[in-house]
Amino acid sequence: MKTHNFVSVRLFGGLGNQIFQYMAGKSLAVDRECDLHVDSSWLQDGYTHEKSTISEFRFFQPDHKYERKHRNLLHLYFDRLATVASRNSAFLARLLGIHAPKSAGFEDLSELEIGTQLRGYYQSPRYFMKLADSGVISEASFELLEPSQEFDSLATQLRRSGYIAIHVRGGDYLHNKAGYIQMTTKYYLDALSLLGSKYSDLPKWVFTDDENHARNLLASIPNLNFIEVKIITAAETLILMSRADAIVCANSTFSYWAALISGKTSSIVAPRSWMEKTNRPEDFFPIGWQII
């Protein structure tokens, strides 16, 4: 007889992915009126980016956290095997108590049993919007718990004149076998053109994990400034980006969340295509964003 009174979610990947996963888990826990347990063992094992942790945000309030690393490679292997088995067999998914969807987007979680662990991407704004509509969470919930002095200094500097935030992903995006589409110089030129004269005189600040790549990609765009992201955390970088007057997103969940919590619409530009073989669902982009 099952006595669980919780659902759980496994976090992995960069900060944008972690936020999507947490929102899916929180939405399910609220629906079921049960506790939310968060499994960050994969983050402890290094399945994330440097300085990328969701726990810096005020909204991150799980009822229980499981933060231990896997005991050894064999333990990690069997854990991976359980995920794959659950993804391919509904029977094993119920037996193991794992929800491992084949798609990266929205999943109807209403039929899941209490005690199930979510192991997927859940890249849909629906979970966040549902929580926001019910008052459980809001854009203000993304307040940083302990902002650093470096963050405060940058925030003050940027606030003086206003700014456009331009996000460029490099690093793993240039070599990842998952098939990310590479953003082109034309995309960024078109995006800035779409924003129009209203923002043309604002300083342009580039947020990137690969400055050399970004400088080469944006060489034809004059008067760029580059945020020194190594001195602040991923959460702090996301908040700085969200406070911009206009945002040019990359095909990244990181700048997606910065734009989503900014409260802006027409001053957000994002690429329509993210992956080579899959498309974003129609409801992925909020109404009013400029999608090109």
Predicted features, each with a name:
Residues V38-S40, A165-V168, P203-T208:
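Short beta-strand segments
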